[in-house]
């Protein structure tokens, strides 16, 4: 019972600090807006609540259970005895190596600075390696195909070619069913694959062979894509919008120049410009002099033309009790091309029928299929599937646009590209806010600005280095052997990095808090930190191994949502493993560099300040330290 009470009183400070730290680190995530906030707000609030409850349990139920369930002496026998003796040997090994690092602190500082600098360099270089994206591509078991047909294509032509594309999807071995939606000059189709447990081939493996077969179909242009892992995306990942008050043709000229540069640089697997000036348009031009000479009524002429080709109903008639619409329209064979309009007869005076060619001519021109606008400005959009990362593709388009576009043109984005621009740039602010919150919490808990620096500097950069390795080794499109155990820099890995800050900080909290307590008991700083690191080794290893073991299954999952879970799991496992190993040796050395002497404060608190000033204690009367040299650490002599 007494042991449980002593242990609870000894750990109440670290438990409170770790609980508040872990809860505070999720606050910036919960406060985010946009897509990231919508995705992770519940995640952050749930974990913050779970951490708080865990802290309450650790301070109340755990001591009670320890007092009633643990028996004295049971740790020396059986399996528990084997585990304890093994850990004692590991602690002795750690103690001997810790002594060496404390005796070679300058080398430790150089190593710490080098690893921290490497972590900064990695996160600066990772986006340039082509591995930054909004979210990792998920195997959703679906492939979409976007159909583009010529502007003058008929619905029958488009359906015929789209059916041929549908057969390509149907012939894939793992096809479950296909779907198709066709319009005169565009369409949409695709396939749904069999469940993940039935098929062995991933969805993306089918894309090259599908594209090769679709490319051989004449009459339409169709490119297969995997749907975005996040909601709100357009048909294609790249959606780069050029807006201006200039006319559409002028904007299109600049867009074609930028698009040509991108194709030359092999930025796109497939690319397109939404504004196409290829729509044939015919206009009936009337000779008003002839119309007046023949006494034609233009309103009646318009009604006659509309009735002939428009397909509008004029009235109803009844047959055998049923009502039917009357829809006048000339035969299709007589309206296949605009020149045939001249053969239409219009009503003249006294119900005379006059050929339209008598009073009108046909004017042909080419216009844009559609005139698009964005933010009340004329807009032209460059879209496509990038051959590089989405971030690299957008960066290239931005650079070329800045070189080509004159003043008065504004760049914008839609779909996944907009999400990447808005959500992908929030990480630094959220990360820094998390560090500030943790620092303030620790400063209040330790009543010091030095101790939070020791905890954060001794753990966070090293954990970031460990997590960054799994993103630094990521190569675009799986072209490297490390692809299975690496992840991209995306919103899931970013949330993992923020979470990692709170998880790895608790290691430093345990060491620093206990070292301060030892100093207040009269132990010198060097002996205090050496003893604190040895004593706190077991709880640090227990919590760290439990964290790694709990997240390791995320690195092994497959199927729906696997990429997102892999991303979080790899960041937490890698960062926690490497961060914990380094923290055990770096934090003690940084403590010697930054921490203040607490044993002087303890003397003053005990009312010894005046006596100390009068006697001027000699150095030899201070608590002496010695290392036994056998790995048992620093002891007070």
Language model features by range: what are they?
Residues 4-16, 35-48, 90-106, 127, ...:
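Alpha-helical membrane-interface segments at transmembrane helix boundaries
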Residues 9-11, 79-133, 191, 240, ...:
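Signature of alpha-helical transmembrane segments and their immediate interfacial
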Residues 12-31, 38-80, 189, 507, ...:
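Transmembrane alpha-helices and their membrane-interface boundaries in multi-pass membrane transporters
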Residues 27, 31, 49, 440-536, ...:
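Hydrophobic transmembrane alpha-helices and their membrane-interface caps
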Residues 29-39, 113-152, 198-201, 234-237, ...:
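Transmembrane helices with small-residue packing motifs
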Residues 112, 119-124, 141-151, 186-198, ...:
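Short, hydrophobic beta-strand segments
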Residues 144, 156-234, 259, 289-311:
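Solvent-exposed, membrane-proximal periplasmic/extracellular interface segments of envelope transport
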Residues 252, 257-434, 438, 443, ...:
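Extracytoplasmic/periplasmic membrane-proximal domains and adjacent transmembrane bundles
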